[in-house]
Regions:
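Soluble "head" domains of membrane/secretory-pathway proteins
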Residues: 1-143
Length: 143
């Protein structure tokens, strides 16, 4: 979400890019998302970046990232943000993930090859895939 020189911040659960709020529209579909030891049903939103790119993000309002410091992306680095806004280990965790160096980018994602709902079953337990495989997400080309 963040390019070199960009600033990113969450204020009261709202995402700001370069001090501008990212518009989000609530969608009808709800998701059951694991966050720590709880699995709440959460609201989903369509967010739109300044370049017009749209994507779905979920907010469960139980994570610790409702309000963050201001992140300024260094040169030759990028800022990655998970779609589970309140419970993703992403660039906001500077000591463990942090900003991603451009030398660590090795290609472009083209397809979601495999998607598993870990709430319904472990990806390692292939005998449960009939319950946990998210076929509607698997094998989709990325835009």
């Amino acid at each position: 979400i963040g390019m070199p020189g960009d600033t990113i911040q969450f204020r009261n659960g709202n995402l700001f890019l370069n001090n501008n709020p990212i518009p989000k529209i609530k969608i009808k579909k709800k998701y059951k998302i694991r966050c720590g030891t709880s699995t709440p049903v959460v609201n989903a939103y369509q967010e739109t970046l300044p370049n017009g790119k749209r994507y779905i993000a979920v907010y469960n309002k139980i994570g610790t990232m409702q309000n963050t410091d201001l992140y300024k992306v260094p040169s030759n680095h990028f800022f990655f943000l998970g779609d589970n806004r309140d419970c993703s280990k992403d660039s906001r965790y500077l000591s463990s993930v942090g900003y991603v160096s451009s030398e660590n980018l090795v290609g472009n994602a083209k397809i979601i090859f495999f998607s598993n709902d870990s709430i319904s079953g472990s990806v390692l337990k292939f005998w449960n895939w009939n319950q946990s495989l998210r076929i509607e997400r698997s094998f989709n080309l990325l835009k």
